[in-house]
Amino acid sequence: MKRSLQALYCQLLSFLLILALTEALAFAIQEPSPRESLQVLPSGTPPGTMVTAPHSSTRHTSVVMLTPNPDGPPSQAAAPMATPTPRAEGHPPTHTISTIAATVTAPHSESSLSTGPAPAAMATTSSKPEGRPRGQAAPTILLTKPPGATSRPTTAPPRTTTRRPPRPPGSSRKGAGNSSRPVPPAPGGHSRSKEGQRGRNPSSTPLGQKRPLGKIFQIYKGNFTGSVEPEPSTLTPRTPLWGYSSSPQPQTVAATTVPSNTSWAPTTTSLGPAKDKPGLRRAAQGGGSTFTSQGGTPDATAASGAPVSPQAAPVPSQRPHHGDPQDGPSHSDSWLTVTPGTSRPLSTSSGVFTAATGPTPAAFDTSVSAPSQGIPQGASTTPQAPTHPSRVSESTISGAKEETVATLTMTDRVPSPLSTVVSTATGNFLNRLVPAGTWKPGTAGNISHVAEGDKPQHRATICLSKMDIAWVILAISVPISSCSVLLTVCCMKRKKKTANPENNLSYWNNTITMDYFNRHAVELPREIQSLETSEDQLSEPRSPANGDYRDTGMVLVNPFCQETLFVGNDQVSEI
C-alpha cells in the first residue's frame, strides 16, 4: 500500500510540474506586444496642445492634424514640421522615436481665396540606431505639397532657387527621377514652357468649370490601403495676399521629439473657425491607419518660414505671384530634402516618401493627390532641412512635375534609388525597411512585401503551434514518469531483501544431521544372556579381561552400519 502511494505521489508531482511549465509557456506566448501609438489631433484642438508620446526603445508616434475650413473666409493652412533632437558629438543614442506630422486642408467653398501653396507637410525623421558611428547624422526627409498658386511669376526670383527644367513630353519617369543635379531657373521661362506644359497636362480646366478636387492623404502601414473619394468642387484663384500688410501669419504645427517624452503642437493665428469633419477616418489601431479629408476647394494660404525650435529650419514656402489664373497649367510639385551622412545622390518621386525610423522595420508611404491650377513655371521654393551639429552634407532635390489626376496612386510613383538610399542609410540589418533592388520604376508599387517585416522586434517572441506544445509536454512528462517508476521498483526490491539464515551452509548441515537421527533412532541392545551362563553370571559376575567380549555374549552395534552385527569375530547375524 505504501509503495503504491509513493508511485502516485511521484506521478502527481510530475503532472504539477508539467502544468506549471505549460502555463509559463502560454503566458509567454499570449503576452501582448507593444503597438505603435497613434495620436489624432482634430481641427478643433486648442493651441498649445501637449501630445505625450511614450518613450520606449522603439516607438513610432504619428500625429495627424486635419484642418477643414468653413465656407467663406480664408484661413491659414497648417504647416506641420517634425524636427529631431540632435545629439551632441555624434554619440549613438539608445532610443528611437519617429514622429510623422501631417496636415490635411479640407476644401470647402467655390469662392475661396487661393493665394499660395496650401499645406506644406514637413516630415523630419529622427533615426537613431545604436550601430551608427560618430559623426554621422540621421537622414532628414522633408515633403512639401503646394496644391495651388497663381500663375505669373514676378521679376525677382525667390531666394536660392533650385529647380529642374521642365520634363519634355517624351521623357520617361526614370530619367526624370534619377537626375539629381539642380538647375537654376530662367527668369523668362514661364512663357517658353507654358504651351508644353499645357499640352502635357490636359486636365487643366478653365475658370468656373466643375471638376473633382481635393486632397487624399494616406499613410500606408502594412496592408491597409483604403481611401475615400473627395467631393468635387471648383477652384477660383484670386489676387494673392503675399507681400501685403494684411497677409496673415502662417499657422505652424510643430511636433518635436524631445527626450522629455512630449510633443508640443503650438498654433498661431487662424482667420477662420475650424470644426470637425467626418472625413477623418481612423483604421485599426494595430495594423495601420488611413486618413482621408473630404471637402471642396482648399482655402490656400502661404506657409512662410517660421522656426519652431532652435534646431528647426523655416517651413518651406512658395511665393504666389500675380497673373491670369488660366495662364499656367495645373501641376503638383513635391520637394524632398534629404540630409544623409554620405553625399550619395538620390532621386524623388512626387507624393511618396519612405521614412527610415530606427531598429524597427516600419514603412510609411504617403500618397498625396492635390490637383491645382496656376502654379508658375519659374516659381520655385527652397526647403531648408534642420541639420545636425555633426558633419552633414545637405542635398536639396526638387521633385518633377506630374500630371494632375483626381486620385494619385502609388502604382508608378515609387523610385528605385530612393529605396536604395533608405535601405542603406544605416548599417544595421533591422533598420532596412525596403530591400534594395526590389522596387523598379516600371513595376507596380505593391507594399505587401514591405509589410512582412512590419512586426516590431521588441523581444524574442516564441510562437508555438499545438503540435509543438504537445511535443514539449511529452518531452517533459516522459522522463519524469519513467524516473518515478524506476525509483518505485528500486524501493520495493530493497524492502524485499531481508536477512535469511538459509543462505548459510552450516545451517543446512546441522539440519540434515538432526533430521537423520530423528528419523533413524537406534536403540542399543541390552545384555543378551544365555540360559547356561545366566546363573553363573548371577552367581559371580565378572568383566571381560582386556575388553574381550567374545565369550560374554555382548553385541557391538554400529549405528551407521545397520546391515550387520558383529558378535565376536566369526558370528555375523542379520538384523
UniProtKB/Swiss-Prot annotation:
Residues 31-169 are annotated as: Interaction with SH3GL2. Residues 173-407 are annotated as: Interaction with DST (isoform 1). It is a multi-pass membrane protein. The keyword Glycoprotein applies. It is found in: Membrane; Postsynaptic density; Endosome membrane; Cell projection, Axon. InterPro entries: TMEM108. The keyword Transmembrane applies. The chain crosses the membrane at residues 9-29, 469-489. Residues 65-398 are annotated as: Disordered. One of its GO terms (cellular component) is postsynaptic density. Transmembrane protein required for proper cognitive functions. Involved in the development of dentate gyrus (DG) neuron circuitry, is necessary for AMPA receptors surface expression and proper excitatory postsynaptic currents of DG granule neurons. Regulates the organization and stability of the microtubule network of sensory neurons to allow axonal transport. Through the interaction with DST, mediates the docking of the dynein/dynactin motor complex to vesicle cargos for retrograde axonal transport. In hippocampal neurons, required for BDNF-dependent dendrite outgrowth. This is Transmembrane protein 108. It comes from Homo sapiens.
